[in-house]
Amino acid sequence: MDESYTAVDDVVVLSYHEPAGPLGFLPTHAYLIKGREPILVETGLYTQTAGFLAALRAEIDPAELRWIAITHEDLDHAGNLEAMLRAAPRARLVLSFLAMLKIARPDLTTPDRVLIATPGQALTLGERRFGVIRPPVFDSSATVGYYDETTGSLFSADSFGGLVPAPTSTADVRDPAYLDGSTIFMSANSAWLHDVAPAGFRRALDVVRGLRPEVVLPTHGAPLKGESGALCDHLEKLPGTEPFRFPDDAAFRVMLEQMKAQGGRAA
């Protein structure tokens, strides 16, 4: 895990950058919202359980959490969910209906502990109101995003994320490094982008444009402040880009060696 930092007001980034070989690093963050009823958005990468819990404990006793919100069930978003539900016995789990079906555990996801998040609705989480949206780009049909009305923060899941050349706590939509990294990541992560109907995709982007969030908080990227319009304009161009070509086995073996040198996972 990296050093945690404040994104905006009382929102803390529990930061981690996963080495990605020649592609650089993939940020894989979770977010802690402090307050009378603390909220954890995402639960970190499953390979980082000990470090994730240590980073969280540096900010708050996990037992004080009242809400754990995940955007979807993938292990880079919900990787430490079981550990968090056990460490925070009074916390309720916020997730989409489909995500609940995919990860249902009779000992952990009991009906009284689950709150279903449905796009188009708003949830009351203690003193916070969370608007629920379907992010414009996603890799799981169970994905939802959360808009915190108090801070104007949009927790956008995979949307607006991207690879970075080095670990960082800042991002700028005008930076070519951000544009290149986000194009590669979202093209690879959501291959359907290259077949999407432009009008339908524009409608999805217009949901974000209508919110005009003060800060966009991707799971896979640094906070993006005051840039939601430019971010949507960038995404709108992605269907016209070349699809990402994944490495073959020989290239994969080279990547493994590069990842070892970076200190990341070798499998």
Residue positions per predicted region:
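Conserved beta-strand hairpin/beta-sheet module of binuclear metal-dependent hydrolase folds
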Residues: D2-R57, G145-D148, G152-D158
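Metallo-beta-lactamase
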Residues: T6, A91-P218, P223-E227, K237
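Active-site neighborhood of phospho(di)ester-bond hydrolases with catalytic His/Asp-centered motifs
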Residues: V41-T43, L65-E73, L93-F97, L154-D158, ...
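Short, glycine/acidic-enriched loop or turn micro-motifs at the edges of active sites
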Residues: L45-Y46, L75, G161, P223
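C-terminal regulatory/interaction regions
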Residues: G226-A267
